Amino acid sequence: MSTVNVQIGLHELLNGSNAQIQLSVPQLVEKVLMRNEGKLTSTGAVSASTGKYTGRSPKDKFIVKEASVADKIAWGAVNQPISEEHFNKLYTKVLEYLKEKEELFVFKGFAGADRNYRLPIQVINEYAWHNLFVHQLFIRPTEEELTTHESEFTIVSAPNFKADPAVDGTNSEAFIMVSFEKRIVLIGGTEYAGEMKKSIFSIMNFLLPEQDILSMHCSANVGEEGDVALFFGLSGTGKTTLSADPNRKLIGDDEHGWSDNGVFNIEGGCYAKCVNLSHEKEPQIFDAITFGSVLENVIINDQTRIADYNDTTLTENTRAAYPMHAIDNIILPSVAGHPNTIIFLTADASGVLPPISKLSKEQAMYHFLSGYTSKLAGTERGVTSPQATFSTCFGSPFLPLDASRYAEMLGEKIEKHDAKVFLVNTGWTGGEYGVGKRMNLGYTRAMIQAALNGELAKTETAKHDIFGLEVPLHVPGVPDEVLMPEQTWADKAAYKAKAIELANEFKANFKKFDSVSEDIINLGGPIA
């Protein structure tokens, strides 16, 4: 199937009598309720369930192996190849399936807040609530922009279309396929809305580096003096929570680009975890869940329609999607200068990493490439308790290119703009998972505040005798004993054994980076 034929098929779909293009938020909410796709909550948000797929399905994600990208993609377990023949046949079947639907919902918008680098996109949805989701998550065009909008990438989403693995070359009924040549994302068999968001992120992670822009899985905010901070970390490590600071303006909560001009948000909304959400803990997120927002897999009371954020009956990966303007202290457009401070967030299930450490450039490169954290319950199917993992660049599932490409760009930018880098453990303290407890959020906020305001630049540090990290001895608002993880363990010998075990895991994982400079290994990694 040629690119021309792909475009003809899209044109027919978009011009069919069933295509509802660029509906407003109230119209989409009405459609969701009329079609019985979701319920209205007491705050006016739409609550929808995603069925059995309550998280991403990494094993069902494919990139079409096309001549133009075959030698650029880092093929493997993350970037699984699928043939053009399989894609073309499945694409044709999905289009025929969607043509028969009474209604289709189309959103046109952008990815990338910096006008110099934004990607015009369109999303064709089988579900109205999915269209509401992308309306809130991506960048919405003005009426004037809409008149000249020409999509450069299209998502075609058909959750109720099930693939046949024996025929379609998939691993299950679900599929998320990206064709860079045809500029199509094809999604089916899963109702999890996050697949649409992350597909566009994966695409930007391919396109932006070609323009010498570092694409990053991070949140970002900016202080009153224009100082920019980045927060890296996988789902559930605290990116959204910790960057929602009442004293700083939010640039974005999850996906950014770093160009020669500075930092820009890739999205136009936020996709926040809301398990155990309360107004007391996270007022910005709690208050953002208003009319037009989307709640995913959140249980609501049948009579009062009040959301119960503590109920994890469906999944722990409950989510809220809302536009940037639902938060008070944001910066719009979502662009800012170069980062002054970079925070690497890790949820260390072994409980041995310090709650905060200062990193040299080499250590920053090492820990960026390592991307150590723990997979937390619910962010992927089948994960019900924390599992130690190394996710390269804190975003391995979304990186189509070789990891060294992103790491080299980060190292260059850290050096050029003199950014200060810190490793922050939001995981366990006083013992490993099951023995210790989760790090106190108030302490984490105090440590990050000290990093942002420059206090940690002048505080005394001690070198960790196993990881070689520089650990501050004093942080305002944090008990000194919390800063040195060994002090929080009752059994000091057990701590040392566990720390050495983790250090060895770091070393074993790093062996896969055979083209990395010796300086990064010798000066950046564990010393014991």
UniProtKB/Swiss-Prot annotation:
It catalyses: oxaloacetate + ATP = phosphoenolpyruvate + ADP + CO2. One of its GO terms (molecular function) is phosphoenolpyruvate carboxykinase (ATP) activity. Its EC number is 4.1.1.49. It is an enzyme of class 4 (lyase). The keyword ATP-binding applies. ATP binds at K198, H217, G233, L234, S235, G236, T237, G238, K239, T240, T241, E282, R319, T444. Mn(2+) binds at K198, H217, D254. Substrate binds at R56, Y192, K198, R319. Pathway: Carbohydrate biosynthesis; gluconeogenesis. PANTHER family: PHOSPHOENOLPYRUVATE CARBOXYKINASE (ATP), PHOSPHOENOLPYRUVATE CARBOXYKINASE ATP. This is Phosphoenolpyruvate carboxykinase (ATP).
